[in-house]
């Protein structure tokens, strides 16, 4: 759905990714659901089944692909990806997510971003990414989302494989310097 924000920008190149493409392309999967939804917004979309891609009237695209193993990184090498949606990201490896993040760059008039969907899995690497938004261990509702933190944006810096979080981009720059 988020891709719809940018479909009027011919330079937008969105991606929907799952661990394997079977779940993406089966009837009732993400691709067929997206076609139904996108067609309501832009009846002139072109469906490129072979390429697993939807092309909007403006020229903006949303492609559907997989990231099943390390070799699949080659699918994204050299690409400029405006927006990435990774469905069921708890099935992904953390290194795959970071590789995709490294592909985020665009000529579209938007800030490139990635968004991840997942079901709760305390053994997933994502647990440490969402901990701040959850009630702490000392709270009776430990592990559940804290509604007071709903919608709050946090910033992440990865340095030498370690993650650092801040409430603002400036906070992280002040602590660690500007990475650019």
Model regions: which residues?
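Phosphate/NTP-binding elements of NTP-utilizing enzymes
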Residues: 1-180
């Amino acid at each position: 759905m988020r891709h719809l924000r940018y479909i009027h920008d011919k330079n937008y190149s969105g991606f929907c990714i799952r661990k394997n493409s079977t779940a993406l392309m089966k009837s009732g999967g993400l691709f067929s659901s997206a076609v139904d939804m996108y067609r309501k917004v832009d009846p002139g979309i072109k469906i490129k089944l072979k390429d697993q891609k939807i092309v909007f009237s403006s020229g903006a695209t949303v492609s559907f692909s997989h990231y099943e193993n390390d070799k699949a990184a080659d699918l994204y090498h050299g690409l400029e990806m405006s927006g990435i949606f990774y469905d069921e990201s708890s099935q992904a490896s953390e290194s795959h997510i970071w590789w995709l993040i490294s592909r985020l760059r665009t000529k579209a008039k938007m800030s490139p971003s990635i968004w991840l969907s997942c079901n709760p899995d305390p053994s997933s690497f994502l647990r440490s990414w969402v901990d701040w938004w959850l009630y702490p261990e000392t709270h009776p509702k430990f592990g559940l989302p804290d509604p007071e933190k709903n919608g709050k944006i946090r910033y992440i810096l990865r340095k030498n494989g370690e993650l650092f979080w801040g409430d603002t981009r400036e906070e992280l720059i002040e602590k660690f310097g500007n990475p650019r």
